[in-house]
Swiss-Prot record:
One of its GO terms (molecular function) is structural constituent of ribosome. This is Small ribosomal subunit protein mS23. Component of the mitochondrial small ribosomal subunit. Belongs to the mitochondrion-specific ribosomal protein mS23 family. The keyword Ribosomal protein applies. It comes from Aspergillus fumigatus (strain ATCC MYA-4609 / CBS 101355 / FGSC A1100 / Af293).
Length: 258
């Protein structure tokens, strides 16, 4: 049999032999069906189809007065594949992936904001109107910028990727600034009515930094003392060495009686 296993292909022949030898009393009900529709015997593995990225754009074509919807196919670079990677499944790509990568590369701290992870169909963005950035019932985040930029590319005539990114980014900055102002005003109103919020994040960070500095200062002082003790073990204590030098000077000045 070699490296190929034909047991599944020969299941009908095996059932007939077992029935003839008396191992099974009656032939299986699927015996005639397998005889009419035998399993495939193709041993050649086909390569997975390669899909290209299709983008929707609204452009004003030459000779037309109104913008038209145009579907562009992104040319895929043809590069040789290794034999071990030839039959791997095709990688699924969406246009949003490139927009999302660009936004979070420019705004990495947006990933540090808390997010609400709710299991859904993954098509929540289709239920919103992305003609504006802020959506009712949805928290403003980086995904809103990505969907807003994609809507501009798909619906605004002759819109470029950089221009759509600038428009969505400016709207995002304006809404973020509005949220910060609302948060600051709410905190001031609460403090005016007697609420206390405790130390701010900056004050907490400074306190932790001071504690770390004091811990390092104590450690450095102990290390300096240990270093002085190691040095004194070889050369003697500084005060003893100074006393020995003074005794030697006195002995040189004062004559010893004979």
């Amino acid at each position: 049999m070699g490296k190929y296993n034909f047991t599944a292909l020969r299941v009908r022949q095996t059932a007939l032999r077992q029935h003839a030898a008396g191992k099974i009393r009656a032939p299986p009900k699927w015996l005639d069906v397998v005889a009419d529709i035998p399993p495939a015997q193709v041993l050649v593995r086909n390569q997975a189809p390669q899909h290209q990225l299709v983008r929707q754009r609204v452009k004003t074509l030459p000779g037309t007065s109104k913008p038209q919807v145009v579907f562009e196919v992104q040319e895929k670079r043809i590069k040789p594949k290794k034999a071990s990677r030839m039959f791997l499944p095709t990688e699924i790509k969406y246009e949003e992936d490139q927009l999302r990568q660009e936004f979070f590369r420019d705004h990495p701290w947006e990933l540090a904001r808390p997010r609400v992870l709710v299991e859904s169909t993954g098509k929540d963005s289709e239920h919103y109107d992305w003609s504006r950035l802020q959506q009712p019932g949805k928290r403003l985040d980086g995904e809103s910028v990505v969907q807003r930029q994609l809507w501009l590319l798909n619906n605004v005539p002759d819109m470029t990727k950089s221009a759509a990114y600038d428009i969505a980014r400016c709207e995002f900055y304006r809404l973020r600034l509005q949220e910060d102002i609302e948060r600051r005003v709410a905190a001031e109103e609460a403090e005016a009515t007697g609420a206390t919020f405790g130390p701010s994040l900056l004050e907490v960070g400074m306190e932790l930094e001071n504690q770390e500095y004091e811990r390092w200062k104590a450690w450095a002082k102990m290390e300096a003392q240990l270093l002085d003790q190691k040095t004194a073990a070889f050369t003697g204590a500084p005060e003893i060495a100074a006393a020995d030098d003074a005794v030697e000077e006195l002995e040189e000045k004062v004559p010893v009686p004979v």
